[in-house]
Amino acid sequence: MSDDEREEKELDLTSPEVVTKYKSAAEIVNKALQLVLSECKPKAKIVDLCEKGDAFIKEQTGNMYKNVKKKIERGVAFPTCISVNNTVCHFSPLASDETVVEEGDILKIDMGCHIDGFIAVVGHTHVLHEGPVTGRAADVIAATNTAAEVALRLVRPGKKNSDVTEAIQKVAAAYDCKIVEGVLSHQMKQFVIDGNKVVLSVSNPDTRVDEAEFEENEVYSIDIVTSTGDGKPKLLDEKQTTIYKRAVDKSYNLKMKASRFIFSEISQKFPIMPFTARDLEEKRARLGLVECVNHELLQPYPVLHEKPGDLVAHIKFTVLLMPNGSDRVTSHALQELQPTKTTENEPEIKAWLALPTKTKKKGGGKKKKGKKGDKVEEASQAEPMEG
């Protein structure tokens, strides 16, 4: 196969090199999450935590593929966000922001890394206190974790996206929680964080997606967000939005000099992946970004909120649909949970959890170190899954 033909062929998991790049990106983002968690202490500034996560990813990816002839793009695939309590997502404030985390806060950490455009994302929920998590906080995290475990077992060749949407809603209901509307799980491809195959969190008349079947050698970002509230989050303040992605298919002649300046900087620095306004020349950024968003040159990732007092949990993971089964490559162990609800009397949920993630190989192929594949059904709902 000539180089040109190879370029044209879409790179997927049939290439061992591609699998390695996904797993390397996953290893880095898992470590970045661990680092940010270790820095989450009462009174820590959220912006400092976010910057530490991004800096670690940049440093670690920068050390890879240094000596190859062809330049390999690598770095942050989604800026580190830390969304607290009833804030649902995308909180990654500017350097001037003084918001801190407090004892007892429910922290949702979300981040992504890529190597050569092969993306690994992770989302995790942590309560900032010692000892087991109890009450409704434990319920909402257990609901999210159990839904993630069920999704892992249903995102497999032959199953449909609608199967996952229905199942995760049933899991959340068992814990008297709601899956949050508007959260999408996407197929990912090289340099594409939000591919065309989509899993809805909640199916309703307002949000329709094409029915799709999962196929071998695909990669998905599975994104589960659960709330003790009504699961219909609102945008409260557009000024909180700091994460954007360039819309590569749109063009417009910007009128303002500040907009042209900032869009030129974005096109050079962040042509494809989502980025944070923190990484732009901040004084001009605010002014220029508005016109870019108004004319759809940039897709904003808004900061959404449930009602005050609602608790929101988030788990996101990357899964590779390999020929021998599903390989969850990003995760982090949860704290001990003592939920008030259980799925003990939910045979359908128990049956989903009993599904294996790996297909049994004849003659037992080489096994990698401790993936908890087929044993999750023995664990309680509160048990974390380490990937």
From Swiss-Prot:
Annotated knockout phenotype: Growth retardation leading to small dwarfed plant and reduced tuber yield. Young developing leaves contains a reduced number of larger cells than controls, whereas at later stages, during expansion growth, the cell size is abnormally small.
PANTHER family (UniProt xref): PROLIFERATION-ASSOCIATED PROTEIN 2G4, PROTEASE FAMILY M24 METHIONYL AMINOPEPTIDASE, AMINOPEPTIDASE P
Ranges for region RNA-binding: 47-55
Protein name: ERBB-3 BINDING PROTEIN 1
Region Interaction with RNA: start-end pairs: 356-373
Gene name linked to the record: EBP1
Signal peptide: none
Native organism taxonomy: Eukaryota, Viridiplantae, Streptophyta, Embryophyta, Tracheophyta
Bias kind Basic residues: ranges: 358-372
Family according to the record: Belongs to the peptidase M24 family.
Compartment(s) where it occurs, according to its Swiss-Prot or TrEMBL record: Nucleus
Location of the motif Nuclear localization signal: 360-369
